[in-house]
């Protein structure tokens, strides 16, 4: 044990937080979570242990601008100005100091290992009682599951120890410091330490005791570590549970270890042995360790599909059976290996349907409770995710237990990222930083290796490739050969990774960056000598309105066996709740707390909002990742299961044939599909169609019974096919009255019954419509070629740092946003049964023509206005965002009804999850409330739109809301938007894709760009 004087002044003088060689003082060795049961039945059933006591709750807290400002008296008693805060928490979420959001740039001046003298310091204290029985025998430990970023600990005025690495536990022996009755803890937490240079993750930088604190009482002679592993024969019909147990204390001949394996109430196997292992070298073996092997016949295998859980109970007792203590853990029988270029689980190649997940809560910062963790797991399971990467640090210990039990594959990642270093491997190639890196990797493995859900270890994130990585890779492979190791840094395919694990590599496009080229994922597989599997550690950057092109990845994953999936970036938007002057909550991002440096809204890349409300993109991910695939041939549907281990036993296939959204026939068939098997379903003959319209077949896979992660009726998969467009003859309608044209110096006015249309002869636009005496338009109907930029359109552009390659900057530079219409033609003609208005506009900027738009408006006796639009795009202008029409309608109706793709927002490169049907939603649901306002709410493939008294027909895309594109473009936060008068309608003949391979470079695939020189579309606008 390190002995340091109790004086605060001496501790401050040592400056342990600026010494990379000091990662801890007096911290106990890492191990799996302990509870020290004194009853084996309680250990088996995982009941609360009387030896494990939570210290969560209200603590006294004082904040200081630097550790030197802390008075010595604080070690002995609470300060008069102390506040009360809840532990666990981040102090920034209680109004102390400010959270800082930055992605790459360090929030402090880069001068490792030194940190600023202005180093915000939180002083926590707690008074608690200890029963004398805990002091008479045994060892009392204190466990801090997470403290950011470093801390010194005192107990009853005496210095105990020091710890850093904010994402792993720090555990200390308090036995020598405690007294019976009242005791006082004092914890001095520093915001910055040399460890901060290894924690440069893309996240909010927060501080404090943000995970659980607990006391644990262990006997003097105790279990100090145990490790379980599962071994199999070739066909997995027999297994061995291998348990290695280590003890601490007096080694007596009478000591025994019993390991029992349970499945529910049934004991499957048991074994007992004294301590002492096999001979290791010429000096012998470990006297304080023992390894037992338990044979298990026909084990029920663990997988994310069927997470069969056993329970292993480890008992330390005397030869006569007197129990000293018991520890326990969940066990999953499973094998992970790489063979022939494939990552295998239980002998079958995995397809990773993964997502990255930060520990984030909009109200509580980085504090995770069980409810939030379960909510995240249910979201993943319900949306067909089977894997999660703990980006970029070990998670709360409970997370892994929940993943074991619900069934998720976990990449457990060390708390190492040096993204802001130049070069990035400046620290990871420096032997002075090897001790700190070693602690972060080895202690993660020692804590989490008993969890079956952990199938891959990760050495960290974005830290270049250094010799320290190679050393730690070899250590893991030596200590735990049962799992692969991955690491992306240095090019994603270095000697420190068993898996090619690039981030944001594209399907077909190479990105030949210097030193670390990012090949297309297809090309990577074919590089000479390369035989590793490829799993993208990050892909499909889900920032704002994104995830375009997601289907392209999944087509490749299913086509090439060694492309074994990836992890979407990421699950949850990292916005935080702030309150305005009236106490109303709003969502904040980088810079909103006065934090500098900051990376603005780049913290919001989630498939769900911070409150876990889904983004529309989540449905696209769910659909592409679904475990059932479908093929239609005539009236035969072939259903293929992508489950590797699960026979469908809770699925019904519902099918519906509908004509323009009106069901004609339907049925349901139970699915009985073996793992990786097929089922063929024959549909009945369909009735002869008498009506015109689009005929669609839709299938849904429904779970009739609830599961651990879904309610009854959950839809797990779906597909839709367009069967035909019925073109039966429509009888001519009766003759109508002929609309009347009136021409004035300023307008063309067309009247029919109680309707009027007015075209301004100076602008050439439809300037007004009347139904009776009610005006229908607040702004004219005009061309629209722009959109409120998406995050993907903006890229890395900022007001002070323009990226000329970003779509929005190209559009701005070309004048798309500033273009004005020059009228070239505006004529009116009376036909035999209609009035025809013809207009031609040149959309210009600074004398240059960007677009020419030719439109005809044919208003006939039925009151229909048929609009035909032809647009020419200048060859030297950037591809436009959209080609369409926009206006502000006077009405605000409650609901929107349309026949087209829905119900969720969809875009040309993100619409595979949308279904063609007749949809009806509240107007408010047509707007997607992205925290950073942008273009949103598009619905593609629309044949008919009904809103208020109006109907539009054709083949178009539309969005409709109370917010104009201009307001969306000019507003920084959604809570600052105000509902405008009337309703804004955008009808597009064509709309560019949204992209999403990443959010910092143009990523819209060529096939979804508006690259043609001419465009033609048409629609009919009438009143119902």
From Swiss-Prot:
Residue sites binding Mg(2+) 2 per the record: 598
Give the GO terms filed under biological process for this record. lactose catabolic process
Q: Which Pfam families match?
A: Bgal_small_N, Glyco_hydro_2, Glyco_hydro_2_C, Glyco_hydro_2_N, LacZ_4
Report the active site residues. 462 (proton donor), 538 (nucleophile)
Note on cofactor: Binds 2 magnesium ions per monomer.
Keyword entries, A-Z: Glycosidase, Hydrolase, Magnesium, Metal-binding, Sodium
Q: Quote the catalytic activity from the record.
A: Hydrolysis of terminal non-reducing beta-D-galactose residues in beta-D-galactosides
Q: What is its EC number?
A: 3.2.1.23
The protein in question is named: Beta-galactosidase
The scientific name of the source species is Escherichia coli O157:H7
Report which gene this protein is encoded by.
lacZ
């Amino acid at each position: 044990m390190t002995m340091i004087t109790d004086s605060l002044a001496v501790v401050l003088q040592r400056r342990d937080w600026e010494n990379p060689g000091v990662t801890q003082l007096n911290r106990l060795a890492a191990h799996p979570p302990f509870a020290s049961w004194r009853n084996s039945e309680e250990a088996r059933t995982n009941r609360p242990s009387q030896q494990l006591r939570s210290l969560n709750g209200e603590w006294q807290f004082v904040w200081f601008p630097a550790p030197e400002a802390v008075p010595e008296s604080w070690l002995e008693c609470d300060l008069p100005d102390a506040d009360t805060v809840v532990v666990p928490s981040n102090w920034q979420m209680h109004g102390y100091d400010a959270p800082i959001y930055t992605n790459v740039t360090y929030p402090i001046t880069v001068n490792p290992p030194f940190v600023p003298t202005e180093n915000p310091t939180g002083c926590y204290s707690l008074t608690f009682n200890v029963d004398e029985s805990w002091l008479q025998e045994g060892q009392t430990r204190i466990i801090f599951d997470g403290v950011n970023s470093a801390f010194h600990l005192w107990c009853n005025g005496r210095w105990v120890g020091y710890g850093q690495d904010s994402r792993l536990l720090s555990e200390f022996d308090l036995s020598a410091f405690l007294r019976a009755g009242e005791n006082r803890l004092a914890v001095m937490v520093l915001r910055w330490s040399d460890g901060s240079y290894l924690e440069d993750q893309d996240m909010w930088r927060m501080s404090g005791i943000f995970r659980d604190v607990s006391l644990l009482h262990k006997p003097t002679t105790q279990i100090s570590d145990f490790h379980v592993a599962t071994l199999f024969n070739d066909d997995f019909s027999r297994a061995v549970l291998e348990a290695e147990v280590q003890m601490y204390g007096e080694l007596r001949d009478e000591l025994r270890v019993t390991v029992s394996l349970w499945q529910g109430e049934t004991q499957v196997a048991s074994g007992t042995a004294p301590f002492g292992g096999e001979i290791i070298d010429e000096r012998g073996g470990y006297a304080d360790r023992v390894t037992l092997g338990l044979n298990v016949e026909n084990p029920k295998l663990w997988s994310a599909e069927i997470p069969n859980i056993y329970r292993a109970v480890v008992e330390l007792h005397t030869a006569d059976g007197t129990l000293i203590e018991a520890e326990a853990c969940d066990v999953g029988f499973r094998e992970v290996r790489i063979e022939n270029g494939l990552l295998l689980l239980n002998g079958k190649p995995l397809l990773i349907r993964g997502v990255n997940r930060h520990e984030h809560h909009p109200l509580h910062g980085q504090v995770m409770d069980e409810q939030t963790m379960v909510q995240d797991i249910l979201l993943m399971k319900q949306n067909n995710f089977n894997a999660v990467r703990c980006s970029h640090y070990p998670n709360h210990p409970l997370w892994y237990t929940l993943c074991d039990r619900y069934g998720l594959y976990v990449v457990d990642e060390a708390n190492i990222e040096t993204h802001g270093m130049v070069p990035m491997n400046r620290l990871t190639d420096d032997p002075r930083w090897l001790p700190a890196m070693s602690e972060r990797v080895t202690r993660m493995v020692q804590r989490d290796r008993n969890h079956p859900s952990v199938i891959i270890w990760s050495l960290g994130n974005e830290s270049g490739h250094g010799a320290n990585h190679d050393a730690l890779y070899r250590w893991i492979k030596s200590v735990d050969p049962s799992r692969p190791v991955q690491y992306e840094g240095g090019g994603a395919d270095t000697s420190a990774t068993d898996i090619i694990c690039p981030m944001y590599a594209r399907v077909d496009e190479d990105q030949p960056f210097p030193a670390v080229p990012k090949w297309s994922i297809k090309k990577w597989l074919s590089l000479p000598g390369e035989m590793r599997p490829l799993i993208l550690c990050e892909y499909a950057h889900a920032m704002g309105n994104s995830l375009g092109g997601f289907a392209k990845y999944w087509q490749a994953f299913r086509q090439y066996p060694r492309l074994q999936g990836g992890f979407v970036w990421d699950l949850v938007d990292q916005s935080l709740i702030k309150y305005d002057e009236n106490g109303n909550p709003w969502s904040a991002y980088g810079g909103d707390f006065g934090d500098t440096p900051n990376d603005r809204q780049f913290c919001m890349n989630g498939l769900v909002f911070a409150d876990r409300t889904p983004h529309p993109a989540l449905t696209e991910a769910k659909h592409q990742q679904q475990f059932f695939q479908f093929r239609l041939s005539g009236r035969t549907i072939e259903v293929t299961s992508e489950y590797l281990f699960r026979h469908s036993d809770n699925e019904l296939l519902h099918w519906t044939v509908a004509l323009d959204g009106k069901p004609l026939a339907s049925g349901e068939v139970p699915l009985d599909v073996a793992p990786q098997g097929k089922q063929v379903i024959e549909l009945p003959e369909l009735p002869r169609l008498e009506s015109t319209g689009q005929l669609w077949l839709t299938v849904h896979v429904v779970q009739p019974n609830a599961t651990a992660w879904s309610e009854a009726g959950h839809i797990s998969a779906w597909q839709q096919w367009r069967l035909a467009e019925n073109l039966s003859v429509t009888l001519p309608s009766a003759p109508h009255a002929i609309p009347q044209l009136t021409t004035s110096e300023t307008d063309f006015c067309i009247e029919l019954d109680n309707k009027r249309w007015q075209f301004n002869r100076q602008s050439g636009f439809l300037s007004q419509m009347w139904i009776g005496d009610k005006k229908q338009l607040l702004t004219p109907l005009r061309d629209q070629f722009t959109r409120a930029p998406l995050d993907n359109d903006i890229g890395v552009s900022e007001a002070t740092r323009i990226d000329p390659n970003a779509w929005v900057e190209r559009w701005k530079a070309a004048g798309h946003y500033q273009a004005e219409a020059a009228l070239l033609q505006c004529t009116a003609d009376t036909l035999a049964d209609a009035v025809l208005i013809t207009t031609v506009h040149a959309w210009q900027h600074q004398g240059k023509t960007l677009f020419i738009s030719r439109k005809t408006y044919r208003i006939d006796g039925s009151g229909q206005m048929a609009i035909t639009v032809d647009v020419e795009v200048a060859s030297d202008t950037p591809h436009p965002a959209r080609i369409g029409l926009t206006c502000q309608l006077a009405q605000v109706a409650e609901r929107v009804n349309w026949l087209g793709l829905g119900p969720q927002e969809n875009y040309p490169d993100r619409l595979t999850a949308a279904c063609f049907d007749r949809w009806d939603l509240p107007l408010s649901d047509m707007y997607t409330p992205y925290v950073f306002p942008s273009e949103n709410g598009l619905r593609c493939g629309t044949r008919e739109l009904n809103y208020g008294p109006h109907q539009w027909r054709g083949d178009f895309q539309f969005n409709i809301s109370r917010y104009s594109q201009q307001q969306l473009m000019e507003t920084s936060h959604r809570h600052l938007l105000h509902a405008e008068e009337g309703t804004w309608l955008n009808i597009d003949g064509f709309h560019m894709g949204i992209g999403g391979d990443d959010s910092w470079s143009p990523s819209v695939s060529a096939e979804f760009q508006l690259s043609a020189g001419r465009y033609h579309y048409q629609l009919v606008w009438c009143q119902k």
